[in-house]
């Protein structure tokens, strides 16, 4: 199979998470712009920094596809916007929830609620669409800022000031005054700092600057 290359850095990638219930209703749609992916060989392509936001037109396309094929359950779509044409392309759809699905919970929409209500409780819930912008990342802020442009950097800093930043590993309830709690805290802190070494080795800033360095402006995608 031959296909044209879709240009753009990590920020041109988008994630859409959906859930379709037994009545073929798309009860959940959430999405986020990927800012940076993991570049280590064993985890290549996994998003590690994202900003959640709604993409109404992509939601329409996703809903039409899922209902058209009679889907039931979770679906995770990977899109990439071509940096030259601005056209979003769907790369794949996975019949499962994504590894980074917690970005939906960070924005106030827990995917498990829709599954439990549909499959276990047998209830019909009101369809929801993600509409909050939050910053989700497992990396130190200043590391991510090295791989985005100034405008994207301003967005990240603004969300930090608004306390709309979330790290799925950062859960103080696990850090009680016990040996187990202290070990967990040490793991989280060491893991975060270890990313500096991983990116220097696998994706140095010099390599990032060899390609497209501007970050994707999603204004058109978020417009109703």
Region locations from a protein language model:
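A short glycine-rich, hydrophobically flanked beta-strand micro-motif that places a catalytic Asp/Glu
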Residues: 3-4, 72-84
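Peripheral (often C-terminal) accessory segments that flank ATP-dependent C-N-forming ligase machineries
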Residues: 117-224
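ATP-dependent carboxylate/phosphate-activation module, predominantly the ATP-grasp catalytic core
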Residues: 2-70, 94-119
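Conserved protein kinase catalytic/activation segment
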Residues: 86-88
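Short acidic alpha-helical/loop segments enriched in Asp/Glu that coordinate divalent cations
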Residues: 76-78, 103-104, 128
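Pre-DFG segment of protein kinase catalytic domains
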Residues: 90-92
């Amino acid at each position: 199979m031959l296909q044209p290359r879709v240009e753009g850095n990590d920020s041109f990638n988008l994630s859409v998470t959906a859930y379709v219930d037994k009545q073929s209703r798309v009860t959940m749609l959430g999405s986020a712009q990927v800012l940076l992916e993991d570049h280590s060989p064993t985890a290549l392509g996994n998003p590690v920094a994202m900003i959640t936001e709604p993409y109404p037109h992509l939601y329409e396309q996703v809903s039409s596809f899922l209902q058209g094929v009679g889907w039931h359950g979770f679906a995770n779509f990977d899109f990439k916007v071509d940096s030259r044409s601005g056209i979003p392309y769907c790369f794949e759809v996975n019949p499962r929830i994504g590894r980074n699905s917690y970005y939906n919970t960070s924005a106030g929409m827990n995917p498990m609620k829709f599954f439990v209500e549909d499959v276990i409780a047998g209830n019909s819930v009101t369809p929801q669409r993600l509409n909050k912008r939050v910053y989700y990342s497992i990396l130190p802020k200043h590391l991510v800022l090295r791989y985005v442009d100034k405008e994207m950097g301003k967005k990240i800093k603004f969300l930090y000031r608004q306390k709309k930043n979330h790290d799925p590993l950062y859960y103080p309830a696990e850090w009680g005054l016990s040996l187990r709690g202290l070990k967990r805290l040490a793991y989280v802190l060491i893991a975060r700092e270890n990313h500096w070494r991983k990116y220097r080795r696998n994706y140095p800033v010099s390599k990032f600057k060899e390609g497209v360095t501007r970050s994707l402006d999603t204004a058109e995608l978020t417009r109703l």
